[in-house]
A protein has these predicted regions:
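Helical scaffold of the NTase/Pol beta-like nucleotidyltransferase catalytic core
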Residues: 1-24
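A structural signal for short, well-ordered beta-strand segments and their strand-loop junctions
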Residues: 22-25, 94, 163-165, 170
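Short His-Asn-centered micro-motif
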Residues: 26-27, 74
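Catalytic metal-binding acidic patch
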Residues: 27-68
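Short loop/turn segments at secondary-structure transitions that flank enzyme active sites
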Residues: 48-51, 88-91, 134, 159-160
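A basic- and aromatic-enriched beta-loop-alpha substructure that forms the phosphate/nucleotide-
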Residues: 55-131
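Conserved nucleotidyltransferase catalytic core and NTase-mimicking acidic/glycine-rich helix/loop elements
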Residues: 112-212
Length: 212
């Protein structure tokens, strides 16, 4: 699949006349709890030609390339990324922390060096807490629950605890967050759910787990 993804990135550069400085995996594969039928959520950052940024009519700062059952590929202009970084947007930090990197350049390495200067504990904490609360309220109150929704609530909750405890951006990998922040009494149940999630289809449901 890596070769397929790299080939698609090359097509993007040629068709859009841009330079991609990094491409990573986001979503469940990068978090470490993908299902057998999970798609590939590829995200990239790109730079346009200098003259493109001087056009009076402006130009889109997002490229949406492919969305199907296998590949979900889209990217942001570096200008957009820097604007969001200035606001301490958590998505930028997550992209830059992904454990699955398909492609990167020296420009991306330089970008990563300045990340800590823009991290806001308050903004990031609110982001993850709100995400966890929303998933709990909308998806975890029924008697049957889609397995992945447990992790879409647990991961941001643990990320919020990480931020409170360490005052730095949380890691992408769910296992790292579990090791550092999960209450030991919940570990067996979470490990059981994680094993099920990794071996069952993406949309699989199960009885509500009341301990979580």
């Amino acid at each position: 699949m890596n070769d397929v993804i790299l080939a698609e990135l090359k097509k993007i550069e040629e068709k859009e006349n841009v330079k991609i400085i990094m491409a990573i995996e986001s979503g469940s594969r990068a978090w470490g709890f993908a299902s057998p039928d999970s798609d590939y959520d590829v995200r990239f950052i790109y730079i346009r030609r200098p003259e493109d940024y001087l056009k009076l009519e402006g130009i889109r700062d997002v490229i949406e390339w492919q969305l199907d059952d296998v590949l979900d590929i889209n990217g942001w202009d570096l200008k957009k990324v820097l604007q969001l970084l200035h606001k301490s947007n958590p998505t930028v930090f997550e992209w830059c922390a992904s454990p699955i990197v398909y492609y990167q350049t020296e420009e991306f390495e330089e970008l990563k060096k300045i990340l800590p200067d823009f991290f806001s504990v308050k903004k990031s904490l609110f982001h993850y807490w709100h995400m966890a609360e929303t998933h709990y309220r909308e998806y975890l109150k029924g008697e049957e629950v889609r397995l992945k929704k447990y992790f879409y609530a647990l991961r941001p909750l643990l990320a919020a605890k990480w931020i409170v405890d360490k005052q730095v951006a949380p890691p992408m990998l769910f296992d790292e967050l579990v090791s550092a922040e999960l209450e030991p009494a919940l570990l067996p149940e979470v490990e059981r759910l994680l094993e099920m999630k990794k071996n069952l289809p993406e949309m699989e449901k199960g009885p509500k787990v009341h301990s979580i």
